[in-house]
Amino acid sequence: NCKVALILRDLTEAGVSASDGMEDGLRAVEAAKALGVPDHAGVALFAEIRPEWSVSHNWMLTFAETLVAAGYVPGFIGNTDSSKNFNFDRQCSHYVQATDSVDELRPVYWATEPKVEGEPEEWAPYCPSALTPEEMDLWQSGVIRYGDITANEDYIRQESPLERMW
């Protein structure tokens, strides 16, 4: 049973640092519908926030609200090493606090740090300060290279995030 993570990869730093993510959310919804991804089926649409970018929790909130209103689950991929980029930690933590009592706005969290050699021996992704490592759903812990091909090495702690894939 193969699953695909649907990742919006054409975001810009100017866009994600703005206060309104509705336009990006609508683009993600349109792209999902064009692919035939069913709505109201629990499928996550991920926003990839590049490691060096600044992001606004208001952008995250309106992006997530737009996806939820269209029947999708929000997902965020971000630099979870606060020593490299404290902005994602701070803004994601503001998002967590703002949405704490709204279950449908609970996104799928995908950590990108730390990098480790090989398969991690224990579940220890870095996370925003408002979350615990156990609340990180996926962890991109490294890169695998096969000749000219490069692939991210990603892990899940439990199978439930796969239910959010298409």
Locations of regions flagged by a protein language model:
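Substrate-binding cleft of extracellular glycoside hydrolase catalytic domains
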Residues: 1-72
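Hydrophobic faces of well-ordered beta-strands that scaffold small-molecule active sites
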Residues: 2-8, 43-47, 74-76, 103-112, ...
